[in-house]
């Protein structure tokens, strides 16, 4: 990898952030970027940004949209570009050097942002334009940019007094470092755990799962073992298929107790710090809780609206969960009479219930969804719906696992570049996400195309067997691809208008995710072509399509779990009062659910 391949510092003149990129389609020159380039780039970026802000505040002309709002929107582009690349790489391909840089850089960036957003002269000019907005003859885009700019200053503390601003700066600096430490601790715990199994421990595991565990063991120099980790493609199959209840318990508890072991990676105090600092920040800014502060800038608007939706879903989801729990407990009693249903039993007996009640076998379906064919189905769907096409391109890559495509609009014009990075590794965070390495903007009246990346953690190919996706993984890929489409279709004049409310964004791309299920379910639908067997290129048989088309088992039970998680998150950020320096958390229990079922899913 480029960031780790060079140990000797480069001179400032060779820093790729200081030159115009001559790469295809303007993608970042990953083959030239080194870890040591980032700090000089951040320092220069902040210095240039300061100069651009000084030019605005020292302007003696009357504040206008052009000399204040637009000038502010255009400021800080080098810094923003450096932040994008650094942030994306810290999530997808980090190492100890990058993590150390994070801890050094994030407080500096926090202080820099606060200095600008709390600049009284700058805000006075922004407010002057905002107060006269009705008489300025602004078009719709200009009006929205003006409002978003003003609101961003207010939400950042521009209306606070000097003492409050000073405290807010301290809080933001602490929060920035706390967030970095928290994420790095999680990554370390994910990477530190390895469950070594022998041949006697493999009962119930499909051959593909065994092969992947064997390959991991060989990579670790433990060729006589089978190794399972806390990465989802390893963790979930063991929980789902292993007949060894003690092994399921061991890996489940290891995952659940990450950063909760009283060691150097323990996050309990960091969580307490998060809640304490966020609550104090919300109070400074005039909100009863951090949840109220966050939601005020989303479509929901208020915490009451959020709770109203969650409570509306909760009761029917809870009733369905109770019924399915009862069925799974019956299966458990047949295997182990008198046993108490535990969290680590959920995946195993949910799979048994799927087979028993719905004839749905994930392992039976999986061979028909090779990663290559699912990706082809995504491209096919996008072409049918939007007329866009995808062409493989040779561009600099930040890791050998990544692949890149040029995306062409229906008229053949360049829309952007799309990277895919599918497989887990030690330097990558868990989960799936989509982000930009280069944001869409306009320069000299011409559209600057975005460079977008979809990052996942799917099972790697093993030997001659391609990467085969579960239905959940297929839906994840469609969901993240929906975000990618959003970025690729961006065509806005102003940088400040590229962001969309988070709750709106997630719902939109839930629609793309659901389009996948409908398409797979209807063999004459748009994405039926993504369902070809990885080995013989045969379409999924009619009978299997009918199974997938049927109402999905356990959907509402999963919804119950998801709603409970949302409730828990709202409670964590909805704290209004703290007792001393310690937060006393009270776990809500629901009638009719016994045992630790608030954590039945991962």
For each feature predicted by the language model, list its residue ranges:
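Short His/Asp/Glu-rich catalytic/ion-coordination signatures at enzyme active sites or charged loops
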Residues: 22-37, 86-105, 128-170, 229-269, ...
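Conserved small/polar residues in nucleotide/adenosyl-binding loops
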Residues: 600-602
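Active-site-proximal, well-structured secondary-structure segments within enzyme catalytic domains
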Residues: 145, 177, 184, 188-229, ...
